[in-house]
A protein has these predicted regions:
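Non-catalytic connector elements of ABC transporters
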Residues: 21-23, 31-129
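Internal alpha/beta loop-helix hairpins
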Residues: 1-41
Length: 129
């Protein structure tokens, strides 16, 4: 289905082709957890028995807003840049040395150098390629 193709493609190369992605080197801890630059992350394992690989996220999995559903993980970060995009803003946040760019609605006011909590919703997908 299109949903599966976007959220859980069989191969990382397909994931890169179909939309924006965040890809980080990762080490498989067990069948459902990988460790990457952001820390330990719940994953769907498509590593085919490998323990070294990459974990894929979609940018929309990250948010500064706490939603109705419980987040899978949360991270402390610092806002590095803010770019206005009409009714939304693009925010660059440094989390453990990784600069993550997300789009947020203009509901809240954010400032450069502000310490924030970033929430991850859903799992990453672990690949060996």
């Amino acid at each position: 289905t299109p949903k599966t193709l976007y959220w859980s493609p069989q191969y990382l190369s397909i994931a890169k082709f179909i939309g924006d992605s965040i890809i980080l080197p990762a080490t498989l801890k067990n069948d459902s957890i990988a460790t990457c630059q952001l820390g330990e992350i719940a994953i769907e394992n498509k590593g085919n028995g490998h323990t070294q690989g990459k974990v894929l996220f979609r940018p929309e999995q990250f948010s500064l807003a706490k939603k109705i559903q419980d987040p899978t993980a949360s991270f402390k970060g610092e806002i590095k840049r803010i770019e206005s995009r009409g009714r939304a803003i693009n925010i660059c946040i440094d989390i453990c040395g990784y600069e993550l760019n997300i789009n947020e609605d203009l509901i809240n006011e954010y400032h450069t150098d502000e310490q924030v909590t970033m929430y991850l919703y859903g799992k990453g997908v672990f690949y060996n390629d």
